[in-house]
Amino acid sequence: METATLIAISISGLLVSFTGYALYIAFGQPSQQLRDPFEEHGD
């Protein structure tokens, strides 16, 4: 394969991995530990 193709596939794979990890942190099991500043403020 050409170098440009390998670089494009690598960058695409990293982007998909990062997006999946971000979604897991936002909505998965670790999201229970995140604090909600709007709930803490309470008017």
UniProtKB/Swiss-Prot annotation:
Signal peptide interval: none
Parts forming coiled coils: none
GO cellular component: chloroplast thylakoid membrane
Membrane-topology annotation of the record: Single-pass membrane protein
Cell compartment(s), UniProt: Plastid, Chloroplast thylakoid membrane
Primary residence: plastid
Domain of life per record: Eukaryota
Membrane-spanning intervals of the chain: 7-27
InterPro entries per the UniProt record, alphabetical: PSII_PsbN
Keywords in alphabetical order: Chloroplast, Membrane, Plastid, Thylakoid, Transmembrane, Transmembrane helix
GO BP terms, alphabetized: photosynthesis
Classification via HAMAP family: PSII_PsbN (MF_00293)
Stated family: Belongs to the PsbN family.
Task performed by this protein: May play a role in photosystem I and II biogenesis.
Record's protein name: Protein PsbN
Organism: Glycine max
Gene (UniProt): psbN
